[in-house]
Amino acid sequence: MAKKSMKNRELKRQLTVAKFAKKRAELKATIVNLNASPEERFAAVVALQKQPRDASASRLRNRCRLTGRPHGVYRKFGLGRNKLREAAMRGDVPGLVKASW
């Protein structure tokens, strides 16, 4: 189990990313727009750098919804490999069966 503080930190990051997503997209569009003046583009770069570090989506980490485990998480289910296996063995995941050949 991950510490509660790590889970809360990740939740806070998700909220920060959602809060700044629209503004970041606008600034990035200005930066890559070749029709904008160099001063406008530079101002957009500076504004983007002044935003909080956690506003970037690349700071997010996929974590297991049940345990908070950061590694071995299946995106499709949002669960870590251990909890996904347990859920599959209980029959909680429809259509998921253990491989046998």
UniProtKB/Swiss-Prot annotation:
Similarity field: Belongs to the universal ribosomal protein uS14 family.
Protein's UniProt name: Small ribosomal subunit protein uS14
Function: Binds 16S rRNA, required for the assembly of 30S particles and may also be responsible for determining the conformation of the 16S rRNA at the A site.
GO MF term (any one): structural constituent of ribosome
Gene: rpsN
Keyword set, alphabetical order: Ribonucleoprotein, Ribosomal protein, RNA-binding, rRNA-binding
InterPro entries in the record: Ribosomal_uS14, Ribosomal_uS14_bac/plastid
Organism annotation: Pseudomonas entomophila (strain L48)
Subunit comment: Part of the 30S ribosomal subunit. Contacts proteins S3 and S10.
GO terms classed as biological process: translation
PANTHER family, sorted: 30S RIBOSOMAL PROTEIN S14, SMALL RIBOSOMAL SUBUNIT PROTEIN US14M
